[in-house]
């Protein structure tokens, strides 16, 4: 695994962690909160984004305008059944979700969830490091690398890992600040 391949893989892991962070509620409405909701539409699980336009008319409201009005009730049911704790309001044409301010207890829960997502991201990064180092050691064993080259390559992999873990930590700190901001 070349250094650029490793960095590319690690970048993807960081981006996946960032996407996970985006699904965590903060004090204001954000359409990405609904990214993980899928609706059973004509017998198939369909992402909500594919069925409707999501918008945030103000900081406390998410508005969902389905492309097909017949999907309105299905979308409403999927949102109500999700673990987000939202109560959708259906007016016959659009669904509005009022995003209530978070209680201190919920803020702490969401901080724990963000920490969990960050840890999952770091584990994924460490797994990539392990794979890269195993490959380097294998190449050393086969005689492609000298011992010094192997050590230098392993140090380079570790430095790359440290850089990306610091990035995940930075994203976590930013997300926690967003969550805790009243």
Swiss-Prot record:
Family classification: Belongs to the RRF family.
Superkingdom of origin organism: Bacteria
Protein name: Ribosome-recycling factor
Xref: Pfam families: RRF
GO term, biological process aspect, one: translational termination
Record HAMAP family: RRF
Keyword terms of this UniProt record: Cytoplasm, Protein biosynthesis
Subcellular location: Cytoplasm
MF term (GO), any: ribosomal large subunit binding
Stated role: Responsible for the release of ribosomes from messenger RNA at the termination of protein biosynthesis. May increase the efficiency of translation by recycling ribosomes from one round of translation to another.
SUPFAM superfamilies: Ribosome recycling factor, RRF
The keyword Kinase is annotated on this UniProt entry: no
A GO-annotated cellular component: cytoplasm
